[in-house]
């Protein structure tokens, strides 16, 4: 079984100084790995490493990516992903007439100003299309504000806004829930996978 978890390729963006966040990835109430983000001015470096067992079989997910940004527009991307043996390599950069993205040696010209699923930048909530950094798919998305919700962050209860992003991809439907605090800082995520819900929890 191949488990495509599109959220693993997603980033914060547009932070003005070097910072680091580390999330635990929780699947069926068990920590299965970590996803770290390092932010240096207009650059985001993302690393994920997950390993879990299902039906007595081991599954592995590894992802490394570097994105650069000009405000809310992606300037370049370079990512490599091993989704339990399915390998993806994505590169892309702004060119004269758009954003040229190449995924596993197949190139596509996209609009010049695009965004990935950069959850740390709430501007994604205003988009109609987003690019999946894992495989380069440029997806139609539907974004909804579901309402306010209490959220436990590092042991403390805070009031958040809960958003939903849905999309259809070549690998099936995507349904992602995002929690933002009242300063619009991203604090949590949930997405459905074939074997259960996965959560991102800040360490």
Label each residue range with its predicted role.
Residues 18-95, 119-203:
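Acidic, serine/threonine-rich low-complexity disordered tracts
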Residues 6-10:
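Hydrophobic helical h-region of N-terminal Sec-dependent signal peptides
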Residues 1-4:
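Positively charged n-region of N-terminal signal peptides that target proteins for export
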Residues 13-15:
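N-terminal signal peptide c-region/cleavage motif recognized by signal peptidases
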């Amino acid at each position: 079984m191949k488990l495509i978890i599109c959220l693993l390729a997603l980033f914060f963006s547009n932070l003005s100084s070097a910072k680091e966040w580390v999330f635990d990835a929780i699947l069926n109430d068990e920590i299965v790995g970590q996803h770290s983000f390092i932010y240096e001015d207009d650059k985001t470096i993302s690393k994920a490493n997950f390993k879990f067992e299902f039906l007595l079989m081991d599954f592995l997910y590894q992802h490394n990516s570097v994105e650069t940004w000009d405000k809310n527009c992606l300037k370049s991307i370079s990512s490599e992903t091993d989704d339990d043996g399915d390998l993806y390599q994505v590169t892309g950069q702004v060119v004269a007439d758009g954003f040229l993205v190449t995924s596993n040696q197949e190139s596509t010209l996209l609009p010049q100003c695009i965004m990935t699923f950069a959850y740390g930048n709430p501007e994604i909530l205003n988009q109609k299309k987003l690019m999946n950094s894992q495989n380069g798919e440029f997806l139609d998305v539907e974004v909804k504000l579901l309402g306010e919700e209490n959220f436990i962050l590092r042991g403390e209860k805070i009031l958040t806004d809960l958003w939903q992003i849905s999309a259809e991809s070549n690998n099936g439907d995507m349904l992602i829930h995002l929690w933002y605090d009242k300063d619009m800082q991203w604090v949590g995520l949930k997405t459905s996978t074939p074997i259960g819900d996965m959560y991102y929890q800040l360490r």
